[in-house]
Amino acid sequence: MALISRSCGAASRYSSSHLFLPSKGAEAANVYCNRLSTAASTSSSSSPSPSTHNDRKKDLREDGLNLQDFISGELSEKSKWEEYRGNLKREKGERLRLPPWLKTEIPIGKNYNKLKNTLRELNLHTVCEEARCPNIGECWGGGEYATATATIMLMGDTCTRGCRFCSVKTARRPPPLDPDEPYNTAKAIAAWGLDYVVLTSVDRDDIPDGGAEHFAKTVSNIKERNSKILVECLTPDFRGDLAAVEKIALSGLDVYAHNVETVRELQRHVRDPRANFDQSLSVLRHAKKVKSSVLTKTSIMLGLGETDAQIQATLTELRDSGVDCLTLGQYMQPTKRHLKVEEYVTPEKFAFWEKVGQEMGFIYTASGPLVRSSYKAGEFFLKNLLEKRKTEETTATAE
């Protein structure tokens, strides 16, 4: 069974409930991964539970944002954003209110319904639904760019790590991998008729290669069914195992993504102790080293307390390491147990960082409050870029 990841970076918590509730954030996958999903159904969540454990899950579920938090309201129009007078930086003991620029529209559309129905029929899950991403209507519906995309999470719903921004459930030894998952995932993607697919996963430190072979098999199965579909892999760091990175980089993928998540100075505060900035840089550098034509991509969450100088320095290190594509989005607190949002960054500030990224030479920079590592508009741009490159390579070979 293919599951889904949180666009904020690692992976999302699996849910058997199929209600659409837009996410508070982050890919992940990426895109990022900041939203608690639960295995409780809508009907059971309203009935009293005799178990303290179930009560706790209900409490945590209610701590997060719901559909109404994200649906466009009276201040959602851009012309009215300046009227917002709520605090954007957190004071001690305070929990910030969601600003109007994080509002979105209810997802609709023919292609949206097609993907949703196929998921039900094949009993598959995507990061888009399970992370309750607010961009789901744009991505699934084709939207302005007429390029349908989805993000699939491989290797289960349980992570071996515990990052402080991510609500995915954790265990030292998650259930074993499903050997049929690569084939079944490729079958589902072929049925959807997608142009661009993102594969991501939880961390699986319990597996010798971290699941790299499983990733590679999935890419191969997808490409065998449709060589034209573009595949992005948003991978873990494999604890620095570059052989695992190489296996995926050479699997036939088009984009190799790995998220550094935050600035260098906040790594230990935000990520699991087994992850670090230099290890993530080595993953991105090695992917480019073994396959120079592959596009490398990473994502950063803003609003965790980073400074402008730290962001600038982080972007410089990423560019110096040969990273091609960059996304920056707003961090969202999934539950009260997770890191608080220190600041809601304004759209103007996100636009500033997008300009900085472009000037630094990133091939593509997407920066905005609702931008995630797996983001529709970015995939449209990358699709056109990759197709242009392939055409040029074919022409050069023919000559």
UniProtKB/Swiss-Prot annotation:
Cofactor dependence: [4Fe-4S] cluster
Superkingdom of the source species: Eukaryota
Residue stretches of biased makeup (Low complexity): 39-52
GO biological process, one term: lipoate biosynthetic process
Co-factor binding details: Binds 2 [4Fe-4S] clusters per subunit. One cluster is coordinated with 3 cysteines and an exchangeable S-adenosyl-L-methionine.
Region described as Disordered: 39-60
Record key words, sorted: 4Fe-4S, Iron, Iron-sulfur, Metal-binding, Mitochondrion, S-adenosyl-L-methionine, Transferase, Transit peptide
Molecular function via GO: 4 iron, 4 sulfur cluster binding; lipoate synthase activity; metal ion binding
Main location: mitochondrion
Reactions the enzyme catalyzes: [[Fe-S] cluster scaffold protein carrying a second [4Fe-4S](2+) cluster] + N(6)-octanoyl-L-lysyl-[protein] + 2 oxidized [2Fe-2S]-[ferredoxin] + 2 S-adenosyl-L-methionine + 4 H(+) = [[Fe-S] cluster scaffold protein] + N(6)-[(R)-dihydrolipoyl]-L-lysyl-[protein] + 4 Fe(3+) + 2 hydrogen sulfide + 2 5'-deoxyadenosine + 2 L-methionine + 2 reduced [2Fe-2S]-[ferredoxin]
GO cellular component annotations of the record: mitochondrion
HAMAP family: Lipoyl_synth
NCBIfam families to which the protein is assigned, alphabetical: lipA, PRK05481.1, PRK12928.1
Designated name of the protein: Lipoyl synthase, mitochondrial
Organism: Danio rerio (Zebrafish)
